[in-house]
Amino acid sequence: MPVISNPAVEKSTKDEGTASCSVRSRKRKADVAIFLQDPDETLDSLEMTKKKQYQDRGPWSNEMTCKSPHKLIPTPEKEEHEPNPTNYSHFASLRFSPVSVSPLPRLGWANQDDVWRNMLNKDRIYLRDKNFFQKHPQLQPNMRAILLDWLMEVCEVYKLHRETFYLAQDFFDRFMATQKNVIKSRLQLIGITSLFIAAKLEEIYPPKLHQFSFITDGACTEDEITRMELIIMKDLGWCLSPMTIVSWFNVFLQVAYIRELQQFLRPQFPQEIYIQIVQLLDLCVLDICCLEYPYGVLAASAMYHFSCPELVEKVSGFKVTELQGCIKWLVPFAMAIKEGGKSKLNFFKGVDIEDAHNIQTHSGCLELMEKVYINQALLEEQNRTSPIPTGVLTPPQSNKKQKSDRAD
């Protein structure tokens, strides 16, 4: 991959094209005031003022001081729900129950059960294959990790949102599963084109085509990107609206911090907590084995490592026993994150303070993967020498517990 040298990014004008009827719009509302500022005259002072206000009051609210977010939320009222008729047979090996009760609160703009069923259907329709590299003998799984790490860096340079990156990751993985014998020299073209498509879907002001070509240091021309764009969209069947990992995580964290009578329209969770958990997702997505799990399961399992089982079950609709396999798989990644230290919220020129956590950052995940491999080897060795697997604790057997009680 070429080394990125922080080029001067031009401000892109708003794309005037309308989205296809088969692809729902993912555009955000523009903060017009920010984009009307003269960056050479007023933007610097505006950012300094906002940053000072942020430091004085904290992100969104003073609830940041609470270490256990579940303590802030009253238990929602349970309602009777219709069984979900969706067929989950292709996830049978993961032992997920076919019926998942909606954890969403009452919504003023839609039926919460319909929204939840649609979210679950996304994971059923948009399938991934962790073994797709078997179709490409010239490629190795670590090449995917290098590519995704580079795409994170591109996103940070152009101030693209996390959702844009995770869309690109999904497009890349699903497209590669439809292909055979892709050569190494085409991998970067597929990756940057996936990001190009994702940016046009998600960003208000996506970078220009020539900027995507420029960031590859001339390795991918504009014509090659436009031709590959059509190939990718056709082979994906124009299915370009998955429920990404970070989309699931946003919903779960919002449910964790939602208060009564709120309309579930704007984020209500602390940014600092958000970036700690999303760093774990950024790291684990570099491993091809993440494709073994549905995106919702990955997001819920990541939350498990930063909260309590009761909260995870409440906000995700999954039982911890259903998440156990993914939780254990994430243990080496969580250990590496802990060893690397706490993440800090980054601020970007031209990006509103309240949106800073949504900008995809490049935090050296590729280097952390070396620690992950070391942790995986250590845990495997412990599992061989210990009868009790590490990662997830299990209660003692009832007969042993009775003997222990009698001895006392």
Curated annotation (Swiss-Prot):
GO terms, molecular function: cyclin-dependent protein serine/threonine kinase regulator activity
Keywords tagged on the record: Cell cycle, Cell division, Cyclin, Nucleus, Phosphoprotein
GO process annotations (BP): cell division; G1/S transition of mitotic cell cycle; positive regulation of G1/S transition of mitotic cell cycle
Residue numbers spanned by region Disordered: 1-23, 56-85, 385-408
Protein name: G1/S-specific cyclin-E1
Phosphothreonine modification, residue list: 394
Cited Pfam families: Cyclin_C, Cyclin_N
Compartments, as annotated in UniProt: Nucleus
Record's subunit section: Interacts with CDK2 protein kinase to form a serine/threonine kinase holoenzyme complex. The cyclin subunit imparts substrate specificity to the complex.
Main localization, broad class: nucleus
CDD domains reported for this sequence: CYCLIN_CCNE1_rpt1, CYCLIN_CCNE1_rpt2
An annotated GO cellular component: nucleus
InterPro entries, A to Z: Cyclin (IPR039361), Cyclin-like_dom (IPR013763), Cyclin-like_sf (IPR036915), Cyclin_C-dom (IPR004367), Cyclin_N (IPR006671), Cyclins_cyclin-box (IPR048258)
Family: Belongs to the cyclin family. Cyclin E subfamily.
PTM text: Phosphorylation by CDK2 triggers its release from CDK2 and degradation via the ubiquitin proteasome pathway.
Annotated function: Essential for the control of the cell cycle at the G1/S (start) transition.
